[in-house]
Amino acid sequence: MMDVEVLSEREFEGGWSFELRLGDGDDVTRTLRLSWADYDLWSNDGGDPPHAVAAAVAVFLLSRITASDLPATLDAATARRRYPDADEKIPKLIRR
């Protein structure tokens, strides 16, 4: 499994933006946006730190595609749109 490190977190109107380092030897940096709506969907009780949800989304996406194939900036909802099992699997990947 590829390592995901949250380098920075920034809140904006409607959600958060995270700079992530995705690495397994060749480090790749990507920006992931997480809306409040997607956070509420994946953090069932709302008790998870937003950065943990963002990291879980990245881990999920990396189980499907390579880090270099991810766009430089992406929205977390991309996981839901592309992969029907995202809503089931992402909450299980959140590290508490």
Residue ranges and their predicted role:
Residues 25-42:
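Short acidic, glycine/tyrosine-flanked loop/strand segments centered on an H-E-D-like triad
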Residues 46-96:
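Acidic, low-complexity intrinsically disordered segments
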